[in-house]
Amino acid sequence: MSALNKKSFLTYLKEGGIYVVLLVLLAIIIFQDPTFLSLLNLSNILTQSSVRIIIALGVAGLIVTQGTDLSAGRQVGLAAVIAATMLQAVDNANKVFPEMATMPIPLVILLVCAIGAVIGLINGIIIAYLNVTPFITTLGTMIIVYGINSLYYDFVGASPISGFDSHFSQFAQGFIALGSFRLSYITFYALIAVFFVWILWNKTRFGKNLSLIHIS
């Protein structure tokens, strides 16, 4: 093997080795459990991955600028608990806030997004003005948000939150049945988020500035 071919092989192995490992693991899983490739299982994987895709889109912009956000997952958890307590059905006997009418879904989404934005703003201020590294800042924020989430969960009774408004259940858990394959609504939400972020990164001045920061 010539030096050039050896260098090309090592470059390919460095850049694409993870995909080879994933393919090997996938082959082992399929060999042990052939039902892994069933349409029902694939739809479940797609649904579960969609939530992570949405989170990853937010963190990806930070990674491009050589930052990170370890608190993203905890923020999603806090948003989920708050949203769940506000979107329970009115006739639910175990309603956390029995005097509260069921709030409109868009309003709750805006509320929890605002909470996430405030946490992100705090992270940004600490990083930009106090010169604390993103890793340390968001690690601390992650712990704090987890504590707030635990306190809020204890405040509402520390029991499973259920009995949601039917419109919210359909919004969050609805799907389109294509035979035995179920395409969940949340997958569509993830696709919309991907499209929005693609436009943001590739068609706006803000996105191009992000790319320039990464290159520099």
Regions found by a protein language model. Give the residues of each.
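Alpha-helical transmembrane segments in multi-pass membrane proteins
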Residues: 21, 25, 51-59, 79-83, ...
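Alpha-helical transmembrane segments within multi-pass membrane transporters and channels
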Residues: 93-142
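Conserved small/polar residues in nucleotide/adenosyl-binding loops
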Residues: 214-215
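Hydrophobic alpha-helical transmembrane segments
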Residues: 16-20, 45, 74-78, 106-114, ...
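Single transmembrane alpha-helix segments in multi-pass membrane proteins
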Residues: 24, 28-32, 37-91, 125-132
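Transmembrane helix-bundle core of multi-pass membrane transporters
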Residues: 134-204, 211
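Structural signal for alpha-helical transmembrane segments and their membrane-water exit/capping regions
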Residues: 21-37, 152-153, 198-207
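Transmembrane alpha-helical segments of polytopic membrane transport and secretion proteins
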Residues: 1-16, 37
